[in-house]
From Swiss-Prot:
This is Protein cereblon. It comes from the Eukaryota. Detected in heart, brain, liver, kidney and testis (at protein level). Ubiquitous. Residues 1-52 are annotated as: Disordered. Its main location: cytoplasm. One of its GO terms (biological process) is positive regulation of protein-containing complex assembly. Substrate recognition component of a DCX (DDB1-CUL4-X-box) E3 protein ligase complex that mediates the ubiquitination and subsequent proteasomal degradation of target proteins, such as MEIS2, ILF2 or GLUL. Normal degradation of key regulatory proteins is required for normal limb outgrowth and expression of the fibroblast growth factor FGF8. Maintains presynaptic glutamate release and consequently cognitive functions, such as memory and learning, by negatively regulating large-conductance calcium-activated potassium (BK) channels in excitatory neurons. One of its GO terms (molecular function) is transmembrane transporter binding. InterPro entries: CULT (IPR034750), Lon_prtase_N (IPR003111), Lon_prtase_N_sf (IPR046336), PUA-like_sf (IPR015947), Yippee/Mis18/Cereblon (IPR004910). Residues 321-429 form the CULT domain. It is found in: Cytoplasm; Nucleus; Membrane. The gene is Crbn. Keywords: Cytoplasm, Membrane, Metal-binding, Nucleus, Phosphoprotein, Ubl conjugation, Ubl conjugation pathway, Zinc.
């Protein structure tokens, strides 16, 4: 890419480097072909119908078929101290429950993964807030659940699918003679809070509580009435206290989850209730994994040990941080919360890996602005089968923002969308005349 080295090209390229123009092209024509302003985004509209198979991105078919799958899971006791090997090249803040695809070719990494397969298949992913940070204080255990070895141009390559399991605090880091880091960590527990009404509610009367049956659909007027009636009965014991009912609902897991689900339905109109975790802990992690926030905010969420507080923070972020700007420019708006939509079963954002081993957490939006497109569309190693990708850069600073995806067939819907990498985005709070400055707004963290 223009103005960047080969190392950065490999990180931003989804597939192999392809010739963009014949060698005898003129320099001026080549420049026009190499960098053009994206005009489609100005007229982009949210797709009414999506006929793309949303299960394809989550299966990571670009890694190849016939991967060896493992069953069962490894969970360590809360507050226990464990020594876990660290995979060095993974620069990502992994959330429990989040899928992590990897493509490893360094002999040290290949050897390490082989050893892990023979043991508990668990490694540590350290959480760094920025590249310059030398020591991480927190992280997440990751467990390999699918694995494949192959040779590419005589080089042994290991392809892996792993999933985040448990949060931990780093106690000590040591490097072995073979160069592999070993992390001594303390597994962080999840604080499960009782119901907000448990202190004033008589247990003997619990069996007498009769709640109305849940509605089949959440879109009609009946569902709203059902929720109001349900809330009234659930918090009826608030009448015995000096505090109003709405105050207790602010710290009620079910109420918080319902408010977040309303936001998620704006991103995915076809969102099904049974596709989301019912457990508040798992649900809070699912939401954290698909929020387009920077590493600083994400580490703050990872530190929180209570699902209630995590849900409150996530709802606060979703309500306030409605604008996504270029992280390098900081003031160039790329997209907004209203343009986000889901093209995957796991939500609007997921982690993908390119052939060079770089992991990108990619957010799907149907409209983006202030972008230049670099090169011609390519289907090589596409994370969304049936779509060709084109590298997209910030129009102001030329930093890599993501890719534009265009359908290869006319009957596909959507015909185009944008995949923006989380590491290039900065969530911001829009400033209005009636509001205080964004840097003075404090999020619920």
């Amino acid at each position: 890419m223009a103005g960047e080295g080969d190392h950065q090209d490999a990180a931003h390229n989804m597939g192999n480097h392809l010739p963009l123009l014949p060698a005898d092209s003129e320099d001026e024509d080549d420049e026009i072909e190499m960098e053009v302003e994206d005009q489609d985004s100005k007229e982009a509209r949210k797709p009414n119908i999506i006929n793309f198979d949303t299960s394809l991105p989550t299966s990571h078919t670009y890694l190849g078929a016939d991967m060896e799958e493992f069953h069962g899971r490894t969970l360590h006791d809360d507050d226990s101290c464990q020594v876990i090997p660290v995979l060095p090249e993974v620069m990502m803040i992994l959330i429990p429950g989040q899928t992590l695809p990897l493509q490893l070719s360094h002999p040290q990494e290949v050897s390490m993964v082989r050893n892990l397969i023979q043991k508990d298949r668990t490694f540590a992913v350290l959480a760094y807030s920025n590249v310059q940070e030398r020591e991480a204080q927190f992280g997440t255990t990751a467990e390999i659940y699918a694995y494949r070895e192959e040779q590419e141009f005589g080089i042994e390559v290991v392809k892996v699918k792993a999933i985040g399991r448990q949060r931990f605090k780093v106690l000590e880091l040591r490097t072995q003679s073979d160069g592999i880091q070993q992390a001594k960590v303390q597994i962080l527990p999840e604080c499960v809070l009782p119901s907000t009404m448990s202190a004033v509610q008589l247990e003997s009367l619990n069996k007498c509580q009769i709640f109305p049956s849940k509605p089949i659909s959440w879109e009609d007027q009946y569902s709203c009435k059902w929720w109001q009636k349900y809330q009234k009965r659930k918090f009826h014991c608030a009448n015995l206290t000096s505090w109003p009912r709405w105050l207790y609902s602010l710290y009620d897991a079910e109420t918080l989850m319902d408010r977040i689900k309303k936001q998620l339905r704006e991103w995915d109109e076809n969102l099904k209730e049974d596709s989301l975790p019912a457990n508040p802990i798992d649900f809070s992690y699912r939401v954290a994994a698909c929020l387009p926030i920077d590493d600083v905010l994400r580490i703050q969420l990872l530190k929180i040990g209570s699902a209630i507080q995590r849900l409150r923070c996530e709802l606060d972020i979703m309500n306030k941080c409605t604008s996504l700007c270029c992280k390098q420019c900081q003031e160039t708006e790329i997209t907004t919360k209203n343009e986000i939509f889901s093209l995957s079963l796991c939500g609007p954002m997921a982690a993908y890996v390119n052939p060079h081993g770089y992991v990108h957490e990619t957010l799907t939006v149907y409209k983006a602005s202030n972008l230049n497109l670099i090169g011609r569309p390519s289907t090589v190693h596409s994370w969304f089968p049936g779509y060709a990708w084109t590298i997209a850069q910030c129009k102001i600073c030329a930093s890599h923002i993501g890719w534009k995806f265009t359908a290869t067939k006319k009957d596909m819907s959507p015909q185009k969308f944008w995949g923006l990498t989380r590491s290039a985005l900065l969530p911001t709070i829009p400033e209005t005349e009636d509001e205080i400055s964004p840097d003075k707004v404090i999020l619920c963290l």
